[in-house]
Amino acid sequence: SKGEKGQYFTPRYVIDMCVKMMNPKEDEYIIDTAAGSSGFTVHSIFHVWDAIRERKGLPKGENFTAEERSNDEIKYVEDRVFAIDFDEKAVRVAKTLNLIAGDGKTNVINLNTLDYSRWDEITKQDRWQDAYFEGFRRLKKIRPAGANDYKEFNFDVVMANPPFAGDIKENQIITRYELGKNSKGKWQNKVGRDILFIERNLNFLKPGGRMAIILPQGRFNNSSDQYIREFIAERCRILAVVGLHGNTFKPHTGTKTSVL
């Protein structure tokens, strides 16, 4: 588990709960915008593969094996499943896990999800293109028609456990988000990463899309965060807030969290 910048990889039982609640389908696009080791996407793949095999009247396959996959299973992963993380080491782990899980690993992309205005600059680098070009090419196709930037996408499902320690202090990033403003509508000098991820994840969703995001419990309780809750309530239909035990991310952090 990685503790820098508040990154703590998500326990499997939390991932499984989120995947079952989101219930991704074979024809839906899914992304983890703060992927870490890509637990959400790997287990979503298993979930959909089981559904594909059930549809065909076949027994469930064995996960994390060299078992041969059907064309439908392979095509689902290549076309529909995406993951982004700013940490290149985490991305390498994710690509390895995805390869073990049986997918083509190409849609795990090393980018800063929040700093999308610099994506064009980053993606032109030769070394980056060698590793991530094909996945990025597929990602661009999921933007709304006519889009000329990377602010909005048309994903059906977004799942993420964004870093919840440390602040974003770069004005260039903060001013691209409504939640970069405080409760009085004034631009802030620093904003919690997880706060900006709320808005960013919603921008990844198409209308009617579904999201599961792990947030510090204080976002649901603190009076100073009421404007954040109002922002969410104005844009979403909240289906559940699931409180996680205080030990969920121990020994790395005792921060109380919930899944929205």
Predicted regions and their residues:
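Hydrophobic alpha-helical scaffolding
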Residues: 83-87, 144-148, 153, 157, ...
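Mobile active-site "lid"/loop adjacent to the S-adenosyl-L-methionine
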Residues: 56-57, 164-196
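Conserved Class I SAM-dependent methyltransferase catalytic core
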Residues: 186-248, 253-255, 259
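Conserved S-adenosyl-L-methionine
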Residues: 4, 8-137, 153, 157, ...
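A Trp-anchored, charged/polar loop motif used as the substrate-binding/catalytic surface
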Residues: 129-148, 191-199, 241
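A short beta-strand submotif of the Rossmann-like class I SAM-dependent methyltransferase core
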Residues: 160
